[in-house]
Design a protein with these regions (language model features):
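Compositionally biased terminal segments of proteins
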Residues: 1-185
């Protein structure tokens, strides 16, 4: 996290000085819940005031002019910039569940300053839905680290909704298997 701290602080300072609500997600958030793994970028979920995506994209691109990954086609929900040679992804929240991620974020201390960090439950939900191999390793590590502190009813309710909406019932069953495995170990 050492190399990420300065760009993370710059990004968060920008958001907080302008009153934008956000939550740190991804690998940096994992470290705040006791799971340490290599991460090379910063991911921030940002609430879009009055759903004015254009204004927020413009504000971010004006403040942080160095575009990250210029070879990748732009996604209207992601503003990817480079701050001090670190990729910072501002992921613009869509109404609904993603707003809850920000509402449920908790203030955590980060080496003398603080930031809003995604809850462990919402981090698990995002990782299960993403479904990559490394995401499942993160889910298993979070289950071991956070255990009984997790609100399983909340997690399983949202995973059930995503499983149905995405027509992927295995999301919920695979997660339930991971919970059973962590409880047995």
């Amino acid at each position: 996290m050492k190399n990420l701290e300065r760009p993370l602080h710059k990004a968060i300072s920008f958001l907080e000085e302008r009153g934008f609500r956000y939550a740190v997600i991804g690998g940096v958030a994992l470290s705040q819940w006791g799971v340490v793994r290599a991460t090379f970028d910063v991911d921030l979920k940002v609430l879009v005031p009055d759903t004015d995506y254009t204004a927020l994209r413009l504000a971010l691109r004006t403040a942080f002019r160095d575009r990250a990954r210029p070879h990748v086609p732009e996604n209207p929900l992601i503003v990817a910039v480079s701050i001090d040679d670190v990729v910072v992804d501002f992921l613009l929240a869509v109404p609904g569940y993603e707003e809850l991620i920000i509402e449920r974020a908790v203030r955590r201390e980060l080496n003398g300053w603080s930031a809003w960090v995604c809850s462990a439950e919402d981090l698990i939900i995002q990782k299960v839905v993403a479904g990559r191999g490394k995401d499942w390793l993160d889910v298993e590590a979070l289950l071991l680290e956070q255990g009984d502190q997790l609100d399983q009813a909340y997690i399983q309710d949202w995973l059930g909704q995503f499983a149905e909406a995405l027509e992927q019932p295995e999301l919920l069953t695979r997660y339930q298997d991971a919970v059973a495995k962590s409880n047995a170990g």
